[in-house]
């Protein structure tokens, strides 16, 4: 992710530089098509910069608004989104998400916890199974844990979990989505788009890593909003 951020910043710098370069060339060459191309490109660069500022601004604002576990109302379902594993154990990022879920469970021990995450190519077991084991080890009633072990994307996390709720006759229940603060805004947007009543509980990420992930969220939010929109159209 550090590499992604570096590439993104360098690419953005070149995109902006190319805009000024095209304008200069168009002025020197005095070609109409170059002038038109320069204006179109300049407009696209403007849209890119404005959209980046808006999306990152919304992301930062929403992160500042997230509540602590103790301040969240009682809900029937908690949805923990998966992340990478360390062998058969949950990795540090996923452990931080489960820590928040357990903290909420201890305040509201009648809630059901959906653990959502499939098995990656380099993973021995599914993320859902690893989360299931970790929750049991930390005192969660296994009868209150529901495994969703097919999802490989955030959209699938939300979509497949919604199907679980529907099959249980609880489609209208409000869901507490648990993931890292940089990821939660996107997950909640998808939840809203798919008609899931939701609130968020964020786990913390070290600041040096968080910045990299937040920069990446600009592209992933756009991609996932488009994916979700296409999925909804196809589902009609």
Where are these regions (language model features)?
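Membrane-embedded alpha-helical segments of integral membrane proteins
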Residues: 1-27
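Solvent-exposed, charged interface segments at domain starts and junctions
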Residues: 1-11, 33-37, 114, 148, ...
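Membrane-interfacial entry segments at the cytosolic side of transmembrane helices
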Residues: 30-44
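A structural signal for short, hydrophobic/glycine-enriched beta-strand patches
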Residues: 35, 54-216, 230
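Hydrophobic membrane-insertion alpha-helices, especially the h-region
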Residues: 41-56
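Short hydrophobic helices that act as membrane-entry/anchoring signals
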Residues: 213-231, 235
């Amino acid at each position: 992710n550090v590499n992604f951020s570096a590439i993104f910043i360098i690419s953005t710098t070149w995109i902006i530089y190319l805009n000024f370069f095209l304008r200069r060339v168009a002025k020197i060459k005095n070609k109409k098509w170059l002038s038109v191309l320069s204006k179109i490109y300049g407009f696209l660069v403007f849209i890119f910069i404005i959209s980046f500022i808006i999306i990152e601004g919304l992301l930062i604002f929403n992160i500042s608004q997230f509540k602590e576990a103790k301040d969240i109302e009682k809900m029937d379902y908690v949805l923990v989104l998966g992340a990478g594993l360390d062998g058969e154990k949950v990795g540090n990022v996923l452990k931080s998400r489960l820590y928040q879920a357990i903290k909420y469970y201890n305040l509201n021990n009648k809630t059901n916890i959906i653990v959502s995450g499939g098995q990656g190519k380099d993973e021995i077991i599914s993320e859902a199974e690893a989360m299931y084991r970790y929750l049991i080890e930390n005192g969660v009633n296994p009868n209150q844990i529901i495994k969703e072990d097919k999802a490989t994307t955030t959209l699938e996390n939300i979509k497949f979990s919604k199907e679980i709720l529907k099959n249980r006759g609880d489609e209208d229940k409000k869901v507490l989505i648990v993931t890292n603060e940089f990821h939660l805004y996107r997950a909640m947007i998808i939840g809203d788009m798919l008609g899931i009543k939701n609130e968020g509980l964020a786990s913390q990420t070290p600041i040096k890593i968080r910045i990299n992930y937040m920069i990446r969220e600009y592209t992933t939010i756009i991609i996932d909003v488009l994916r979700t929109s296409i999925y909804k159209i196809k589902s009609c």
